[in-house]
Amino acid sequence: MAKILTVLIVACGLQMSASAQENSPYSRYGLGDLTPNHNVFTRGMGGISAALADHRDFNPNLSINFTNPASLSGINAALPGIKNTIFDVGTEIDYRILKSSNPAKKFTSANTYISYLQIAFPLTTKKMAAKKMSWAMSVGLKPVSKINYKIEKSERLTGIDSLHTLYEGSGGVNQAFFGTGLKIKNFSIGINAGYMFGTKDHSTILTFISDTVTNFYYTSNSATKTTFGGLFINGGMQYDFALAHDEKYPGIVTKNLRVGVYGNMQQNLKAHSNKVREIIIYDQNGGFVRLDSVYEDKDVKGNIKYPAMVGLGLAYQDANWMYGVDLEYGNWKNYRFYGQADAVQNNFTIRAGAQYYPAKGNTPVKKYFNFVKYRAGFYYGSDYIKTTSNRPEYGFTIGTGMPLTSLRRLSYPWQYVVLNTALEVGNRGNKQTNLRENLVRFSIGISMNAAWFQKPKYN
């Protein structure tokens, strides 16, 4: 299977030209190319997410961390009387360069798509706040993976005839989810639940081209179209350790350490497939006639096993700095598609990142860039797609969080829009592997925090 993957990637040739949609031969295996399971805010810090949440005593980031639902409890926790709603949307532009050392070739692809849409509602009451409790909920939609490839390969058979092979695939996996997070004193717990759904369509078209008979094309088509879906659930926990308090106001935390964990058990998705194996013939006008249906089976029921995953991390925060580190693990060896294993393997990733916020309590609001948050990070791990050799996956990231508001409102972070950006430069493979993929991903996120659904007290 791994050798087949290598051949397919090398065979891409000029098919992988820059376009509006990604053309990745890696997406032929497993559930496709996995999309980042992080919002733009955390992507700028290498993707650390397990222990990130807004703290009531620090300047908020106003972004919804869907990776660990326990973090929802931090939304607007500092101002329980204000029921501001956060709308969070992320988009990204990917540019990929795939390199093969033997033979020496280079292919490129580009794509733009929406990373996530989500909205969060704080539910904390004043009575809950008095008991050091906070609560919030969210709803959202995000992609889990993408499948999109078109690979062509031609070869001579007997010196006078040719065989043309076309591999095509499309689809992907998405999640529509509802989340809630509750914090009691220093402990937070949360849960995401919803529906995971998608499609996985594959076809292999073999065309025998006769050089001795004019305009004769003899083609076989093998195609499978699968739709699937099912309920999913994941959860998370966080705990805060106050390392220091304000000398004048002992109830205010000035240094905090948070630990977090999140994950999901193995999920079973119900699937339905339509399979066809047919022989067709192309005429000189480009049309075709079905000569024979070798095999056809409709509405074949089965299951897809989505593997268990877990992540844990810790994060330090004070008025100006935030540091964090995460460890992630995916049990992809248990992935099954209609009972069949695939070219996938267990994978792990380590992430680390930091954020710097220059503004202090006495910073003049005229100094706009002191109110911008600056981020950087990196990640290193193994790819879940299995090839002939272990391929590391690593990258470096930088990002910003820029308030979009007038200068006079910079001191009121709960009442403005934040533009988050993240630039990722990543790699799949190294000098020891025949195939390397370079990635440049630019992400933009908009977090809008406003009292959208509140009735005015006065007309």
Which residues fall in each region the model found?
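Bacterial Sec-dependent N-terminal signal peptides
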Residues: 1-25, 139, 459
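Subset of outer-membrane beta-barrel
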Residues: 21-459
